[in-house]
């Protein structure tokens, strides 16, 4: 046990362990790992679908009682024990080694599909250097006499995404072929990641200044431009208008808790690895609070930026809807051109409905409400590659804004990949399973190459379906289980008193009552509640996916299909296999200890001198 005034007995264990050049590198690395694509395309969606400003109430409650306490534990144990995820948990208890292996496994799986998202971003980024943008118009059909029917039915942006980028199949069972343009982008992405992590924190520490700070510059530029566009005020009003009644819905609280959990990248092992390179007496409490608050403020900042642009898109779509209706009225009733303005349209329509309802009823008039267009938001890739991309399309200088947007997404994803790869590479070195003569550059290259080969399946025509499966099942339940085991392991196995002594030694201040209560009671209860809620949701949800099928009668809506049986088995395996490391390693350690005791007992019996007997 480390005393506040004593020497650290662990410092000499790894004197040669690399250290950050300065504190800013460490903070930016943790922020870059935590602040990822989810801050841009998931939090704004949750905020606007769950009561606007009302969603911030459960969000910040989850931040205070779940996110920050768990984050503090990870930074503290990484800094104190100076090891990666596997080494930390083996040091705390050999029976908890499975937690580290589980975190390692999830980081590996997430790295596979996360870098695939980056290849999509890279493809759009490269195509943004064209004028006009390639998704601004439909291509001509084979006869060169009209436009491709699929594009006319779905829209230019959706067609470019689903057909010209993914070339997606209409069923997950039809794997299709490798899309070579995506394959080359995958090569470029993994090469970029390798060059950035080739020397661990020595190389990522240099790159992180750009990858972590550039997104904030672009968000600020977009915010300034967005606030000057028509409809920005309506978008922000729609986003933050509170609906307090929605707080009665338990799903809102679950989504808030899970968003905090995944947004901070808890239980991946990356933060433990980053903290292990700190000076032993660094103030990790201040770091945990600072990074967590920056992460949450970034989510809010991104939401304001995104919905200022989305308000412009909705206003633009609303205006075009009115223009189409006005044109129909002018053609039907022989009004002079430009005789009906958008402001006059409601009163003119009301008059015609009262005087000539039969003629009006025959017209293909659409119902135009600004709120309906604001409702057409999306989460995940749908926001980045379809909704927001279409919004940028209507902005003056669209190519410039597209380059900035996808450049921002690429740097966001790249800095998150640094943390994922640290969660994979650092434990491998800490386990000492490799010959000491193997250079770090070689080992890092082998890991990146294995990840690249494993991720080739995502470049198939059915690859996006598989990415959705990995995104939905590979991390969610596993990380919740690992986080719960982290709290239990530190508080009840390592010992709360010993842990508090260590923190006092590192920071010079003993953890307050708030920290101890959240670690002992609140955070474990919240994690257990999230785990049960996830199990219930999985049991209630149908094992289905939405396919892009031009032959579907309701196209361009995506057709809902059930996963084949073998795919459902894959989903179950992804959900629980990494977690099986926990009982598996504990059982193996138990058997090992039992075998050792059995050997020692028999050895003692064999060496014990036999009593002399009389004649």
Swiss-Prot record:
One of its GO terms (biological process) is neutral amino acid transport. It comes from Rattus norvegicus. Pfam families: SNF. It catalyses: L-alanine(out) + chloride(out) + 2 Na(+)(out) = L-alanine(in) + chloride(in) + 2 Na(+)(in); glycine(out) + chloride(out) + 2 Na(+)(out) = glycine(in) + chloride(in) + 2 Na(+)(in); L-methionine(out) + chloride(out) + 2 Na(+)(out) = L-methionine(in) + chloride(in) + 2 Na(+)(in); L-valine(out) + chloride(out) + 2 Na(+)(out) = L-valine(in) + chloride(in) + 2 Na(+)(in). GO terms for cellular component: apical plasma membrane; brush border membrane; plasma membrane. Keywords: Amino-acid transport, Cell membrane, Glycoprotein, Membrane, Neurotransmitter transport, Symport, Transmembrane, Transmembrane helix, Transport. The gene is Slc6a18. Residues 48-52, 127-177, 228-255, 312-397, 464-472, 542-571 are extracellular. This is Sodium-dependent neutral amino acid transporter B(0)AT3.
């Amino acid at each position: 046990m480390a005393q506040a005034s004593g020497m650290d007995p662990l410092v000499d264990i790894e004197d040669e362990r690399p250290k950050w050049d300065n504190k800013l590198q460490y903070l930016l690395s943790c922020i870059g790992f935590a602040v990822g694509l989810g801050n841009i395309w998931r939090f704004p969606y949750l905020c606007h679908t769950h009561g606007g400003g009302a969603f911030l109430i459960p969000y910040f409650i989850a931040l205070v009682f779940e996110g920050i306490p768990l984050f503090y534990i990870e930074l503290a144990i990484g800094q104190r024990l100076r090891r990666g995820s596997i080494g930390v948990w083996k040091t705390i208890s050999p029976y908890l080694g499975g937690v580290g292996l589980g975190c390692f496994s999830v980081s590996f799986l997430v790295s596979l599909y996360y870098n695939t998202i980056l290849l999509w971003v890279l493809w759009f980024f490269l195509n943004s250097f064209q004028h006009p943008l390639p998704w601004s118009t439909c291509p001509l059909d084979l006869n060169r006499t009209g436009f491709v029917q699929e594009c006319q039915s779905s829209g230019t942006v959706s067609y470019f995404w689903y057909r010209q980028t993914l070339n997606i199949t209409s069923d997950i069972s039809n794997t299709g072929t490798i899309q070579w343009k995506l394959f080359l982008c995958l090569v470029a992405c993994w090469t970029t990641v390798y060059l950035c992590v080739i020397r661990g924190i020595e190389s990522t520490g240099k790159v992180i200044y750009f990858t972590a700070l550039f997104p904030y510059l672009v968000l600020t530029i977009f915010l300034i431009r967005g606030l000057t566009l028509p409809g920005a005020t309506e978008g922000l009003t729609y986003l933050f208008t509170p609906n307090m009644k929605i707080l009665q819905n338990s799903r809102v609280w679950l989504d808030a808790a899970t968003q905090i959990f995944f947004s901070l990248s808890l239980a991946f092992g990356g933060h433990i690895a980053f903290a292990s390179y700190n000076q032993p007496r660094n103030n990790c409490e201040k770091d945990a609070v600072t990074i967590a608050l920056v992460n949450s403020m970034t989510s809010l900042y991104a939401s304001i930026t995104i919905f200022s642009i989305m308000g412009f898109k909705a206003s633009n779509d609303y205006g075009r809807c009115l223009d189409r209706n006005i044109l129909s009225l002018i053609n039907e009733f022989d009004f002079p051109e430009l005789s009906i303005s958008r402001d006059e349209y409601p009163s003119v329509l009301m008059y015609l409905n009262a005087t000539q309802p039969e003629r009006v009823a025959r017209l293909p008039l659409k119902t135009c409400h600004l709120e309906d267009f604001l409702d057409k938001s999306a989460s995940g890739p749908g926001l980045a590659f379809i909704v927001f991309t279409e919004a940028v399309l209507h902005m003056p200088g669209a190519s410039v804004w597209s380059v900035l947007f996808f450049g921002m997404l690429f740097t966001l994803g790249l800095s998150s990949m640094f943390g994922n790869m640290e969660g994979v590479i650092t434990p491998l070195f800490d386990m000492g399973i490799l010959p000491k003569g193997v250079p770090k550059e070689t080992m890092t290259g082998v890991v990146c190459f294995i990840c690249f080969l494993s991720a080739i399946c995502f470049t198939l025509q059915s690859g996006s379906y598989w990415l959705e499966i990995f995104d939905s099942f590979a991390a969610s339940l596993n990380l919740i289980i690992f986080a719960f085991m982290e709290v239990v392991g530190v508080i009840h196995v390592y010992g709360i008193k010993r842990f508090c002594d260590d923190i006092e030694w590192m920071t010079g201040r003993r953890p307050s009552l708030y920290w101890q209560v959240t670690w002992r009671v609140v955070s474990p209860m919240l994690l257990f509640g999230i785990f049960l809620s996830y199990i219930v949701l999985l049991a209630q949800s149908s094992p289905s996916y939405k396919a892009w099928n031009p032959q579907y009668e309701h196209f361009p809506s995506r057709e809902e299909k059930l996963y084949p049986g073998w795919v459902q088995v894959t989903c179950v395996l992804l959900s629980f296999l990494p977690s099986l490391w926990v009982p598996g390693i504990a059982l193996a350690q138990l058997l090992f200890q039992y075998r050792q005791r059995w050997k020692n007992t028999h050895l003692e019996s064999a060496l014990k001198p036999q009593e002399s007997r009389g004649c």
